[in-house]
UniProtKB/Swiss-Prot annotation:
Matches recorded under NCBIfam families: atpD (TIGR01039)
Gene3D superfamilies from the UniProt entry: 2.40.10.170, Bovine Mitochondrial F1-atpase, Atp Synthase Beta Chain, Chain D, domain 3, P-loop containing nucleotide triphosphate hydrolases
Gene Ontology molecular function: ATP binding; ATP hydrolysis activity; proton-transporting ATP synthase activity, rotational mechanism
Protein's name in the database: ATP synthase subunit beta
InterPro entries, per the entry: AAA+_ATPase (IPR003593), ATP-synt_VA_C (IPR055190), ATP_synth_F1_bsu (IPR005722), ATPase_a/bsu_AS (IPR020003), ATPase_alpha/beta_chains (IPR050053), ATPase_F1/V1/A1_a/bsu_N (IPR004100), ATPase_F1/V1/A1_a/bsu_N_sf (IPR036121), ATPase_F1/V1/A1_a/bsu_nucl-bd (IPR000194)
A Pfam family it matches: ATP-synt_ab
Keyword Transferase: no
Annotated residues for binding of ATP: 155-162
Keywords of the record: ATP synthesis, ATP-binding, Cell membrane, CF(1), Hydrogen ion transport, Ion transport, Membrane, Nucleotide-binding, Translocase, Transport
Bilayer topology annotation: Peripheral membrane protein
Chain's gene name: atpD
Naturally occurring in which organism (per UniProt): Bacillus cereus (strain G9842)
Length: 468
């Protein structure tokens, strides 16, 4: 076993000297196991740089409090490896793949995969573009997700990012029998705890593996925890042929953690103080998230935008990789429209006639045109009232309000709060429902009948009850 000694400690960055000229490889995991009067210490470092002939610079995966120079360090001879397979479902892990829930240790012989690996080879990639049906009307109609695609989820605090994530996990599990992996990267521990309990209550946890590296942890853990989650997802894709959902909350914290250690590793900062390797690190992570001939990983990434500045290097680098964006809007929550997805700001490169078909594309564009015209007319309505509008514009407003309400629906995972049964709406029902509204087939039904329903048949039922 190759052993070295700690020579320098700079917060989360630790230098280790190896005698005999046998240096551990880049990305190898080094461990410290020792006991002293302050208790036992069990640390893992990852090799980041080689300094000269006998010293490596490493990044710690947990706090270095109590570590002293001269401490003996062992080279494990391999990268950090984490458990993979069905044994991970329903469990919660840290960056090293240790179980941190209260359900006991994993079996000793559990299969482990290294967190660093190459993106799939070019010839393994799947070229066919396939839509991932979510059962959520506003997403499927206006900003559809692609299997193996990357989706950015934008929204402030309390607008429903977590509930939307839970519903997606639920629908993929129930309708497609799919598996989800949730990576909590640098977010609040309280939110992770709440999510775990909510998912346990709704029964979704049985089809989900969860990995956390939260705000209070050192940057090494926050930077690598996304790779831990991704490695678990890759196993389900490559070994079991699954279509996996990978949730990363929040992708900005991955970049932020990299920038924290970058200067300590001796790199010159680049724009806005970010690490010079920002685009490379992001690319290495994102390129592994893709569809292959065996299965797919579809990634939904919450994106925090610092100071709402979309030109900041961190969100700007993320955008380059996204196939679709789902924007959540507080204004819609205030109107009681859930999910509060902004139908005009959300985009998808899959919304083209070649991918979704001519009818779907036409209906989606007409819905957006109607809503856009309604938005333009709102100032006139606020100042002069509805009576000043032309008959044509009155009809636009009339239909736009019905469309706006019909874009809302009840979620399965929110049943315990709302008391209303959740609904999963197939894409073809969604398209035909909106097409009929645009054609004026339901102009005579009260607009409240369209609120928080599934398919168009529920609207007709509601209207009958209201008119009875």
């Amino acid at each position: 076993m190759n052993k070295g000694r700690v020579t320098q400690i700079m917060g989360p960055v630790v230098d280790v000297k190896f005698d005999g000229g046998k240096l551990p490889e880049i990305y190898n995991a080094l461990t410290v196991k020792q006991s002293n009067e302050n208790g036992s210490m069990n640390l893992t470092f990852e090799v980041a740089l080689h300094l000269g002939d006998d010293t490596v610079r490493t990044v710690a995966m947990s706090s270095t409090d109590g570590l002293v120079r001269g401490t003996e360090v062992e080279d494990t001879g391999k990268a950090i490896s984490v458990p993979v397979g069905d044994v991970t479902l329903g469990r919660v892990f840290n960056v090293l793949g240790d179980a941190i829930d209260l359900d006991g240790e994993l079996p000793a012989d559990v299969h482990r995969d290294p967190i660093h690996r190459q993106a799939p080879a070019f010839e393994e990639l799947s070229t066919k573009v396939e839509i991932l049906e979510t059962g959520i009307k506003v997403v499927d109609l206006l900003a559809p997700y692609i299997k193996g695609g990357k989706i950015g989820l934008f929204g402030g605090a309390g607008v429903g990012k977590t509930v939307l994530i839970q519903e997606l996990i639920n629908n993929i599990a129930q309708e497609h029998g799919g598996i989800s992996v949730f990576a909590g990267v640098g977010e609040r521990t309280r939110e992770g705890n709440d999510l775990y309990h909510e998912m346990s209550d709704s029964g979704v946890i049985k089809k989900t593996a969860m990995v956390f590296g939260q705000m209070n942890e050192p940057p090494g853990a926050r930077q690598r925890v996304a790779l831990t989650g991704l490695t678990m997802a890759e196993h389900f894709r490559d070994e079991q042929g699954q279509d996996v959902l990978l949730f990363i909350d929040n992708i900005f914290r991955f970049t932020q953690a990299g920038s924290e250690v970058s200067a300590l590793l001796g790199r010159m900062p680049s724009a806005v103080g970010y690490q010079p390797t920002l685009a490379t690190e992001m690319g290495q992570l994102q390129e592994r998230i893709t569809s292959t001939n065996k299965g797919s990983i579809t990634s939904i990434q919450a994106v925090y935008v610092p100071a709402d500045d979309y030109t900041d290097p961190a969100p700007a680098t993320t955008f380059a990789h996204l196939d679709a964006t789902t924007n959540l809007e507080r204004r819609l929550t205030q109107m009681g429209i859930y999910p509060a997805v902004d139908p005009l700001a959300s985009t998808s490169r899959a919304l083209s006639p070649e991918i979704v078909g001519e009818e779907h594309y036409e209906v989606a564009r007409q819905v957006q045109q109607t809503l856009q015209r309604y938005k333009e007319l709102q100032d006139i309505i606020a100042i002069l009232g509805m009576d000043e509008l032309s008959e044509e514009d009155k009809l636009v407003v009339h239909r736009a309000r019905r469309i706006q309400f019909f874009l809302s629906q009840n979620f399965h995972v929110a049943e315990q709060f709302t008391g209303q049964k959740g609904s999963y709406v197939p894409v073809k029902n969604t398209v035909s429902g909106f097409k009929e509204i645009l054609e004026g087939k339901y102009d005579d039904l009260p607009e409240d009948a369209f609120r928080l329903v599934g398919g168009i048949e529920e609207v007709i039922e509601n209207a009958k009850k209201m008119m009875a």
